[in-house]
C-alpha cells in the first residue's frame, strides 16, 4: 500500500472537538524523494522506492552511491518500497506529509524497543508460583514444566520460554490522523506507535 517514511518525535495529547483529551504520537514525515520507479512491464509489479534523511557520501556504499547517482538524487540514509501509488511519479519527485489528510486511517510499521533477555513473567505474563512460602525456594518466577513425561519426549515448538524480548518489526493498524502540519512536516496520529524516540517508521495508507 502507498505510504511514506517518517521519524518518531514523541508523544503528546490534544483535545478533541468534544473536549476529550486524546493521547497522540508526533511523527516527522518526509520529505521523501523517489529514488527508483518500478513498473509492471520491467519489474513485474509497480512500486516506488523512497529515500528519507540525507546521508554523507563517505557513509554510503559504492553500489548505493551509484544507485543514487543514477536517480540524480543526494544519498539517503533510509530506503523503503511502497506499492500501489496512484498517479505518475518520476525519479527525484518529492513527497511530503501533505500526502495524508485529517481523519485518514493509517498503518504504522516500526521496530519495537529492545528489552534484552527477559524471563517468562515479563515476556509472556506468567503469574509465577502460587505458593511463595512452605519450603518454596528460588522458583517464584520460574516457567515450570515445559513438557510431559516419556511421551512425547520432546518440547514442542512455540513453547513460551525466556528469551530475547522486543527489537522486532511491529505493525499497528488503523490509527486515526488527528492533524497534519505541513509547515513543520509533522503528522499527529491517535495512540502510540512502536519504537523509541527518533526511530524510523513506515506510515501506510
UniProtKB/Swiss-Prot annotation:
GO cellular component, one term: cytosolic large ribosomal subunit
Entries under Gene3D superfamilies matching the protein: 3.30.160.810, Translation factors
A single BP term in Gene Ontology: translation
InterPro entries: Ribosomal_uL3, Ribosomal_uL3_bac/org-type, Ribosomal_uL3_CS, Transl_B-barrel_sf
Keywords annotated in UniProt: Ribonucleoprotein, Ribosomal protein, RNA-binding, rRNA-binding
Record bears the keyword rRNA-binding: yes
Coiled coil stretches, renumbered: none
A GO term for molecular function: structural constituent of ribosome
Family to which this protein belongs: Belongs to the universal ribosomal protein uL3 family.
Function comment: One of the primary rRNA binding proteins, it binds directly near the 3'-end of the 23S rRNA, where it nucleates assembly of the 50S subunit.
Assembly, per entry: Part of the 50S ribosomal subunit. Forms a cluster with proteins L14 and L19.
Protein name, per record: Large ribosomal subunit protein uL3
Organism listed in the record: Porphyromonas gingivalis (strain ATCC BAA-308 / W83)
Classification of source organism: Bacteria, Pseudomonadati, Bacteroidota, Bacteroidia, Bacteroidales
Gene: rplC
Amino acid at each position: 500500500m502507498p505510504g511514506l517514511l517518517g521519524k518518531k518525535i514523541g508523544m503528546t495529547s490534544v483535545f478533541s472537538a468534544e473536549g476529550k483529551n486524546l493521547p497522540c504520537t508526533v511523527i516527522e514525515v518526509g520529505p521523501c524523494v523517489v529514488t527508483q520507479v518500478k513498473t509492471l512491464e520491467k519489474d513485474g509489479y509497480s512500486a516506488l522506492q523512497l529515500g528519507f534523511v540525507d546521508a554523507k557520501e563517505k557513509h554510503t556504499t559504492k553500489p548505493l552511491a551509484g544507485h543514487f547517482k543514477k536517480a540524480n538524487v543526494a544519498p539517503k540514509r533510509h530506503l523503503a518500497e511502497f506499492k500501489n501509488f496512484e498517479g505518475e511519479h518520476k525519479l527525484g519527485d518529492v513527497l511530503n506529509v501533505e500526502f495524508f489528510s485529517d481523519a485518514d486511517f493509517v498503518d504504522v510499521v516500526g521496530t519495537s524497543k529492545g528489552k534484552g533477555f527477559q524471563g517468562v513473567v515479563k515476556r509472556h505474563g506468567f503469574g509465577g508460583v502460587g505458593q511463595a512460602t512452605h519450603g518454596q525456594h528460588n522458583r517464584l518466577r520460574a516457567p515450570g514444566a515445559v513438557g510431559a513425561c516419556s511421551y512425547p519426549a520432546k518440547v514442542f515448538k512455540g513453547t513460551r520460554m525466556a528469551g530475547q524480548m522486543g527489537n522486532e518489526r511491529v505493525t499497528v493498524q488503523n490509527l486515526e490522523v488527528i492533524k497534519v502540519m505541513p509547515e513543520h512536516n509533522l503528522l499527529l496520529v491517535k495512540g502510540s506507535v512502536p519504537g523509541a524516540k527518533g526511530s524510523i517508521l513506515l506510515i501506510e495508507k
